[in-house]
């Protein structure tokens, strides 16, 4: 609890699913402020309204696969909310449930961008500030898909294996 209490927590993909649950848990553990990054404005608004009843919540529409947008929105968060103490990379997508030979180039690119490369973009923005303060935590949510093969979700599995390998390597 002491690692979250009084801290600013930023969660990518924080307006739904596991990201939203992580936000609820951060609030329960005493986070000073919760920052939600998500691509779906309607979900952001609903989450800010609901979780805002329990504490300070800020919502930003961010496509984490666009590094320029990540940099711009991170600067905005620092000005409007403060230094991020805890980053939870939770944004993720599944674009198909088919064998690799049936996946389109766009499905492959989008899945890898959001699930594998975006966590790196986001962490790369925040890590220098955390290092300078000698304080901060980065948590990347993957899935069992990052630990085992799945013939009908090979691209998803590859993206999550990449996220797991990268996260383990930078800790």
Task: Identify the function of each model-found stretch.
Residues 2-34:
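Canonical Rossmann dinucleotide-binding motif of NAD(H)/NADP(H)-dependent dehydrogenases/reductases
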Residues 31-46:
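Conserved glycine-rich Rossmann-like NAD(P)H-binding loop of the short-chain dehydrogenase/reductase
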Residues 41-42, 61-72, 105:
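The beta1-alpha1 cofactor-binding region of Rossmann-like NAD(H)/NADP(H)-dependent oxidoreductases
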Residues 98-100, 104-109:
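Substrate-binding pocket helix/loop in short-chain dehydrogenase/reductase
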Residues 100-101, 150-154:
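Active-site loop immediately N-terminal to the catalytic Tyr-X3-Lys motif
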Residues 123, 159:
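Active-site helix of classical SDR
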Residues 143:
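Residue(s) in the substrate-gating loop at a strand-loop-helix junction
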């Amino acid at each position: 609890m002491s690692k979250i209490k009084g801290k600013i927590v930023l969660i990518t993909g924080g307006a739904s699913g596991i990201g939203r649950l992580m936000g609820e848990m951060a609030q329960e553990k005493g986070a000073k402020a919760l920052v939600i990054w998500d691509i779906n404005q309607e979900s952001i608004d609903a989450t800010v309204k609901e979780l805002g009843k329990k504490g300070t919540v800020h919502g930003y529409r961010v496509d984490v696969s666009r590094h320029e947008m990540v940099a711009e929105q991170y600067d905005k968060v620092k000005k409007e909310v403060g230094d991020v103490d805890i980053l939870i990379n939770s944004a993720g997508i599944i674009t198909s449930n088919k064998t690799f030979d049936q996946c389109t180039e766009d499905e492959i690119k989008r899945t890898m961008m959001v699930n594998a490369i975006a966590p790196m973009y986001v962490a790369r923005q925040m890590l220098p500030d955390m290092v300078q303060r000698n304080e901060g935590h980065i948590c990347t949510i993957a899935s069992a898909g990052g630990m085992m093969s799945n013939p009908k979700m090979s691209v998803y599995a590859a993206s999550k294996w990449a996220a797991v390998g990268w996260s383990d390597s930078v800790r």
